[in-house]
Amino acid sequence: RLKSACEQVGVVPVIAVCGDADTGKSHLLQAVCHLAEQNQQSAVCVSMEELFPLGPDSLSGLEGQSVICLDDLDLIAGQENWEEAIFHLYNRVNDHGHLMVVSLSELPASLPFGLQDLVSRLSHGLTIQLGIYRDDDRLRILMARAEQRGLVLSDDVAVFILRRAPRKLADLLAILDRLDENSLRAQRRLTIPFVKSVLGW
């Protein structure tokens, strides 16, 4: 659903990706930007945590991108000036026929936003709720993250990692970070014996 909505920019005004901290929301937003670029569209993915110290003016001009991804948007809930700035950005994005994708820890109506017009706008498009990933989803995410890092991760090694790694996606991706660092340092490919030795499995 997310992929098809992203490929029809201008049809859905906003996509809200909602879920807990370890459900891979940031990874999904990065994938949305990557998909847009593959489709010859301009895209930007920004973290509200990084923008917050810069003030609401840092949002100006973002509507010029075809796809605008705002990660951790719930960080500005209750901040009146930020909420208004996001509301106006949404309207500008909509006027351009572009797409806004936001990630939130909960559904928009469940968060302490003061500006109800913003809540209604964020609820107006496609809402995707993320929960526990199935194993095949986790495998796909693991393989995609490895590819982004330039790591060669074979199917059998990926399945081996999945069988022994914690269920949380954040823990799984942290394991990949460790393997990446160690394989670079040792100049070794990711094999099952190497993974065992690094992780003590």
Residues covered by each model-derived region:
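Short regulatory helix/loop adjacent to the ATP-binding pocket of P-loop NTPases
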Residues: P108-S123
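C-terminal helical "lid" of AAA+/P-loop NTPase domains
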Residues: V159-R163, A170-L184
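Short glycine-rich substrate-engagement loop in P-loop NTPases that contacts/grips substrate
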Residues: E37-V67, A77-E83
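Pre-Walker A adenine-sensing motif
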Residues: R1-Q8
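Conserved P-loop NTPase "ATPase switch" module shared by AAA+ and STAND
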Residues: G61-A85, L89, H96-L104
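Conserved AAA+ ATPase "sensor/coupling" helix adjacent to the nucleotide-binding pocket
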Residues: G125, L139-V152
